[in-house]
């Protein structure tokens, strides 16, 4: 009887491990049934350009107990209170919460917002998450949807910066401006007024991984504008994400910078999958692209601002080990840079694109129950 029980446990664990055995992020932590007692282990698991993001590791735990939101004088127990503290904090949630913010939530540096163990929804018709000139932020396990525009008004930016007037915002789910060392992992994002993720204004050292992007037209913008050349320093890794169903374009759309797009799974798009302007370097590796049935929309790529084919001929857009389905195709250009772009701490193994559907099958928010591995 005991041997049968042990066998059942082993089969169960093997079934879990098989879901992420080749995903280097998930294999770092998801097999731990005691994840709740070792939450900060997560900070050791990022890969790519955002692998140095420590979030609130080494700091205290802060527990969100209330969905209330006061943009100017947040109460202890609310998400805004924890997010705006100056010290390192690992923010967790005591219960399931639906949070409708009254103004964008400015997240101070050295913060992890960790939704594991609760069902956390942010948005719900209000504005959403904002980072400006901060470092070391991790967002994990959040449902972010229904993000709306905000009006101008006063907001507590952080304890140090105090309350300041801010302009109206466009309704992005996650906005990053001039940030470094940020990791966005295992979130589910959809249905917002503008984009789901914006990384702009010389942000760099960002990894966007294991997220599920769906039911949204303009998904991800990397780079502020065609005249903002400071984004040449931008380095972003986009890996192990599920795009779709019903994701239209900008997965991502880049300006300047170096973008590594690896082992993502793309459902059919409505316009294009990967695009850009202003000579970004885009290295597409090990992705699975399934084109829409529309014969005019089979191309994965879209180049913007090319007055003639020669204008963009030197842009480095390369496809390696990608898998193409239903007539999808990638138009490469520029010299072959290879993918030796990382230092030892950032590098990770990229599988062939045929493996991307399996690697991304658990993208988005996971179910995390005490004493069981997250699934």
Curated annotation (Swiss-Prot):
It comes from the Eukaryota. Residues 1-21 form the signal peptide. Its cofactor is Ca(2+). Glycans are attached at residues 110, 148, 178, 293, 352. Ca(2+) binds at residues 170, 194, 198. Binds 1 Ca(2+) ion. Coiled coil: none annotated. The active site is at residue 250. The keyword Signal applies. Gene3D superfamilies: Single-stranded right-handed beta-helix, Pectin lyase-like. Has pectate lyase activity. Belongs to the polysaccharide lyase 1 family. Amb a subfamily. PANTHER family: PECTATE LYASE 16-RELATED, PECTATE LYASE 18-RELATED. This is Pectate lyase 1. It comes from Chamaecyparis obtusa (Hinoki false-cypress). The lineage of its organism: Eukaryota, Viridiplantae, Streptophyta, Embryophyta, Tracheophyta.
